[in-house]
């Protein structure tokens, strides 16, 4: 479908209330899933970030790299495993994750954004003490299970990110971080995005996924919800697929930490960030605090 000039003007005018509401606000976006592997979607995501920045909104990108890490592990002949939705991280796996996240995935996204101008700067959780990690376990069949060098975020130092925002840059964050003793951990990008959104007092947290949003009775396609409150979401958590658990935990953490809304959106939709932020229909599920 080709839009007329009037149609294009109407689209821009319709976005005005959302643009006004988000002006000078921080939006943390967790970049992952198919949006990271499809060239068309990667280009659209980069354009979305530049659009937000040039509309007076402050995007902060936190990226994963699961498919790329898995591909590199396979190429190197290193076994990989997941438990409770989290990657089991041995020292060998950590070395690969560190290399892939900052040197490949983050660098590619920075370059895509910077095709529009000198906007993006890549940093890791190790830089300027951005994240301080603490070792974590996950629940598997009701049992706390060790998953190696996987951390949670114990502290966030937002100084470096705020300096980049003040300079008009788009921070692109890789989620490798040390603990207080200097031991380095792989932090799930969903977890890191939520902690950073809370620490930055972000207006929104957006989580890109490979599904249309949140299903309350998966795989029943009719159970897709456009909005849910945090109490109802917490009740659903034990019933969710393992891969969705870190994302929903992240949404709840952000909401409990004062972020007004968290959004689980379909990263397979071109320009999904703009669709979610600036249209009534959206591109996923919005999570809000219970009243």
From Swiss-Prot:
This is Acetylglutamate kinase. GO terms for biological process: arginine biosynthetic process via ornithine; L-arginine biosynthetic process. The keyword Cytoplasm applies. The record marks 30, 247 as: Transition state stabilizer. Its EC number is 2.7.2.8. Keywords: Amino-acid biosynthesis, Arginine biosynthesis, ATP-binding, Cytoplasm, Kinase, Nucleotide-binding, Transferase. Its main location: cytoplasm. One of its GO terms (cellular component) is cytoplasm. Coiled coil: none annotated. Catalyzes the ATP-dependent phosphorylation of N-acetyl-L-glutamate. Substrate binds at residues 65-66, 87, 186.
């Amino acid at each position: 479908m080709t839009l007329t000039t009037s149609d294009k003007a109407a689209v821009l005018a319709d976005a005005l209330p959302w643009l006004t509401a988000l002006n000078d606000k921080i939006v943390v976006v967790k970049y992952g899933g198919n949006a990271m592997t499809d060239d068309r979607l990667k280009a659209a995501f980069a354009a979305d970030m530049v659009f937000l920045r040039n509309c007076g909104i402050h995007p902060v990108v936190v990226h994963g790299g699961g498919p790329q890490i898995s591909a590199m592990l396979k190429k190197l002949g290193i076994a990989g495993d997941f438990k409770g939705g989290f990657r089991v991280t041995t020292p060998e796996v950590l070395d690969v994750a560190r290399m892939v996240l900052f040197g490949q995935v983050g660098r590619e996204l920075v370059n895509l954004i910077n095709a529009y101008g000198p906007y993006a700067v890549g940093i890791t959780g190790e830089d300027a003490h951005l994240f301080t990690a603490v070792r974590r376990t996950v629940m598997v069949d009701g049992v706390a299970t060790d998953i190696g060098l996987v951390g949670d975020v114990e502290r966030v130092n937002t100084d470096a990110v705020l300096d980049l925002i003040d300079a008009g840059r788009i921070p692109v964050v890789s989620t490798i971080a040390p603990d207080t003793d200097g031991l380095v951990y792989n932090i799930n990008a969903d977890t890191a995005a939520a902690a950073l959104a809370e620490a930055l007092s972000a207006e929104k947290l957006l989580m890109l996924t490979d599904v249309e949003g949140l299903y309350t009775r998966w795989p029943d396609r009719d159970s897709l919800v456009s909005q849910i409150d945090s109490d109802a979401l917490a009740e659903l958590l034990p019933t969710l697929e393992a891969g969705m658990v870190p994302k929903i935990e992240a949404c709840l953490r952000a909401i409990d930490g004062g972020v007004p809304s968290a959004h689980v959106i379909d990263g397979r939709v071109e320009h999904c960030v703009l669709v979610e932020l600036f249209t009534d229909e959206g591109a996923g599920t919005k999570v809000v605090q219970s009243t």
